[in-house]
Protein backbone atom coordinates (compact mmCIF):
# COMPACT_ATOMS: atom_id res chain seq x y z
CA UNK A 1 0.00 0.00 0.00
CA UNK A 2 2.51 2.54 -1.17
CA UNK A 3 -0.26 5.13 -1.51
CA UNK A 4 -1.30 4.66 2.12
CA UNK A 5 2.20 4.69 3.54
CA UNK A 6 1.77 1.36 5.30
CA UNK A 7 1.99 -2.37 4.84
CA UNK A 8 -1.20 -4.11 3.67
CA UNK A 9 -2.96 -6.31 6.18
CA UNK A 10 -3.72 -9.98 5.50
CA UNK A 11 -7.48 -9.43 5.98
CA UNK A 12 -7.58 -6.77 3.25
CA UNK A 13 -5.01 -8.40 0.97
CA UNK A 14 -6.91 -11.66 0.48
CA UNK A 15 -10.14 -10.17 -0.92
CA UNK A 16 -8.17 -7.62 -2.95
CA UNK A 17 -6.06 -10.37 -4.49
CA UNK A 18 -9.15 -12.42 -5.34
CA UNK A 19 -10.48 -9.48 -7.33
CA UNK A 20 -7.32 -9.29 -9.40
CA UNK A 21 -6.65 -12.95 -10.10
CA UNK A 22 -8.22 -15.83 -11.91
CA UNK A 23 -8.51 -16.95 -15.47
CA UNK A 24 -8.77 -13.58 -17.17
CA UNK A 25 -7.97 -12.44 -20.67
CA UNK A 26 -5.55 -9.51 -20.92
CA UNK A 27 -8.50 -7.18 -21.57
CA UNK A 28 -10.41 -8.56 -18.56
CA UNK A 29 -7.31 -8.25 -16.38
CA UNK A 30 -6.84 -4.64 -17.43
CA UNK A 31 -10.51 -3.88 -16.70
CA UNK A 32 -10.22 -5.54 -13.26
CA UNK A 33 -7.13 -3.48 -12.42
CA UNK A 34 -8.81 -0.24 -13.45
CA UNK A 35 -11.94 -1.10 -11.44
CA UNK A 36 -9.83 -2.06 -8.43
CA UNK A 37 -7.94 1.25 -8.47
CA UNK A 38 -11.22 3.18 -8.75
CA UNK A 39 -12.72 1.23 -5.84
CA UNK A 40 -9.51 1.55 -3.78
CA UNK A 41 -9.71 5.31 -4.15
CA UNK A 42 -13.18 5.28 -2.57
CA UNK A 43 -11.96 3.66 0.64
CA UNK A 44 -12.22 5.88 3.70
CA UNK A 45 -8.50 5.68 4.45
CA UNK A 46 -7.57 6.80 0.94
CA UNK A 47 -10.20 9.55 0.91
CA UNK A 48 -8.95 10.79 4.28
CA UNK A 49 -5.49 11.31 2.84
CA UNK A 50 -6.22 12.33 -0.75
CA UNK A 51 -9.88 13.34 -0.94
CA UNK A 52 -9.17 17.02 -1.60
CA UNK A 53 -6.33 16.30 -4.06
CA UNK A 54 -8.13 14.37 -6.79
CA UNK A 55 -8.96 17.20 -9.19
CA UNK A 56 -6.75 18.27 -12.11
CA UNK A 57 -5.82 21.57 -10.43
CA UNK A 58 -4.43 19.57 -7.48
CA UNK A 59 -2.21 17.29 -9.61
CA UNK A 60 1.09 18.56 -8.19
CA UNK A 61 -0.18 18.21 -4.62
CA UNK A 62 -1.55 14.72 -5.37
CA UNK A 63 1.83 13.56 -6.71
CA UNK A 64 3.66 15.21 -3.81
CA UNK A 65 1.42 13.42 -1.27
CA UNK A 66 1.86 10.09 -3.10
CA UNK A 67 5.63 10.58 -3.00
CA UNK A 68 5.49 11.48 0.69
CA UNK A 69 3.41 8.44 1.65
CA UNK A 70 5.50 6.06 -0.48
CA UNK A 71 8.79 7.59 0.63
CA UNK A 72 10.00 8.03 -2.95
CA UNK A 73 10.65 10.88 -5.35
CA UNK A 74 9.76 10.41 -8.99
CA UNK A 75 12.68 11.13 -11.31
CA UNK A 76 12.67 14.19 -13.54
CA UNK A 77 12.86 11.99 -16.64
CA UNK A 78 12.71 8.28 -17.26
CA UNK A 79 12.84 5.67 -19.99
CA UNK A 80 10.38 2.84 -20.46
CA UNK A 81 12.19 -0.46 -20.92
CA UNK A 82 10.67 -3.48 -22.68
CA UNK A 83 8.18 -5.26 -20.44
CA UNK A 84 7.64 -2.24 -18.17
CA UNK A 85 4.45 -0.23 -17.83
CA UNK A 86 4.87 3.30 -19.24
CA UNK A 87 7.32 5.31 -17.15
CA UNK A 88 6.83 9.02 -16.55
CA UNK A 89 8.95 11.78 -15.11
CA UNK A 90 7.44 13.70 -12.22
CA UNK A 91 6.52 16.79 -14.25
CA UNK A 92 5.09 14.68 -17.07
CA UNK A 93 2.80 12.77 -14.70
CA UNK A 94 1.64 16.02 -13.09
CA UNK A 95 0.98 17.49 -16.55
CA UNK A 96 -1.06 14.46 -17.64
CA UNK A 97 -3.36 14.81 -14.63
CA UNK A 98 -3.56 18.61 -14.64
CA UNK A 99 -4.44 18.66 -18.36
CA UNK A 100 -7.17 16.06 -17.88
CA UNK A 101 -5.37 13.49 -20.03
CA UNK A 102 -5.22 11.24 -16.94
CA UNK A 103 -7.87 10.93 -14.26
CA UNK A 104 -6.76 10.75 -10.64
CA UNK A 105 -7.20 6.95 -10.84
CA UNK A 106 -5.00 6.71 -13.93
CA UNK A 107 -2.44 8.94 -12.23
CA UNK A 108 -2.44 6.77 -9.11
CA UNK A 109 -1.97 3.64 -11.17
CA UNK A 110 0.80 5.22 -13.23
CA UNK A 111 2.53 6.33 -10.01
CA UNK A 112 2.33 2.84 -8.48
CA UNK A 113 3.73 1.32 -11.68
CA UNK A 114 6.81 3.53 -11.77
CA UNK A 115 10.11 1.69 -11.43
CA UNK A 116 11.22 3.87 -8.51
CA UNK A 117 8.09 2.80 -6.58
CA UNK A 118 8.48 -0.85 -7.62
CA UNK A 119 12.11 -0.83 -6.46
CA UNK A 120 11.24 0.80 -3.13
CA UNK A 121 8.57 -1.78 -2.30
CA UNK A 122 9.72 -5.01 -3.94
CA UNK A 123 11.57 -6.55 -0.97
CA UNK A 124 8.93 -5.35 1.50
CA UNK A 125 6.14 -6.80 -0.64
CA UNK A 126 8.03 -10.06 -1.11
CA UNK A 127 8.45 -10.50 2.64
CA UNK A 128 4.79 -9.66 3.31
CA UNK A 129 3.75 -12.23 0.69
CA UNK A 130 5.70 -14.94 2.54
CA UNK A 131 3.77 -14.21 5.72
CA UNK A 132 0.47 -14.11 3.81
CA UNK A 133 1.18 -17.22 1.75
CA UNK A 134 2.99 -19.52 4.19
CA UNK A 135 1.70 -18.39 7.57
CA UNK A 136 -1.71 -16.97 6.56
CA UNK A 137 -1.30 -13.97 8.82
CA UNK A 138 0.06 -10.48 9.21
CA UNK A 139 3.77 -10.21 9.91
CA UNK A 140 4.96 -9.18 13.33
CA UNK A 141 7.05 -6.02 13.02
CA UNK A 142 10.35 -7.42 14.35
CA UNK A 143 10.36 -10.48 12.09
CA UNK A 144 9.18 -8.55 9.05
CA UNK A 145 11.78 -5.83 9.51
CA UNK A 146 14.52 -8.42 10.03
CA UNK A 147 13.67 -10.27 6.81
CA UNK A 148 13.48 -7.00 4.86
CA UNK A 149 16.89 -6.06 6.25
CA UNK A 150 18.38 -9.43 5.25
CA UNK A 151 17.02 -9.10 1.70
CA UNK A 152 18.11 -5.49 1.39
CA UNK A 153 21.55 -5.63 3.00
CA UNK A 154 22.43 -9.30 3.26
CA UNK A 155 23.75 -10.84 6.45
CA UNK A 156 26.86 -12.90 7.06
CA UNK A 157 27.24 -15.21 4.07
CA UNK A 158 23.78 -14.30 2.73
CA UNK A 159 24.10 -11.77 -0.09
CA UNK A 160 21.51 -9.01 -0.60
CA UNK A 161 18.54 -10.17 -2.65
CA UNK A 162 19.01 -13.87 -1.88
CA UNK A 163 15.43 -15.09 -1.65
CA UNK A 164 16.38 -18.72 -1.01
CA UNK A 165 17.20 -18.12 2.66
CA UNK A 166 13.98 -16.24 3.22
CA UNK A 167 11.85 -18.95 1.62
CA UNK A 168 13.76 -21.66 3.46
CA UNK A 169 13.12 -19.82 6.73
CA UNK A 170 9.37 -19.82 6.14
CA UNK A 171 9.09 -23.36 4.79
CA UNK A 172 11.08 -24.77 7.69
CA UNK A 173 9.44 -22.63 10.38
CA UNK A 174 7.62 -24.52 13.11
CA UNK A 175 4.56 -22.34 12.54
CA UNK A 176 4.31 -23.31 8.87
CA UNK A 177 4.99 -27.01 9.40
CA UNK A 178 2.38 -27.20 12.19
CA UNK A 179 -0.28 -26.20 9.66
CA UNK A 180 0.02 -29.73 8.29
CA UNK A 181 -0.08 -31.71 11.51
CA UNK A 182 2.28 -32.68 14.34
Residue map of PLM features:
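Composition-driven recognition of low-complexity segments enriched
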Residues: 1-182
Amino acid sequence: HAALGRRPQFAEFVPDMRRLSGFLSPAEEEAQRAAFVADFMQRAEFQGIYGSLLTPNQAANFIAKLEEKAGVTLPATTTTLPGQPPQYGRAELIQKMSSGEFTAAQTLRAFIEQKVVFDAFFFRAFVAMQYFGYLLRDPEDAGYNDWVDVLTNGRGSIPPGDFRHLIFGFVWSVEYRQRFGP
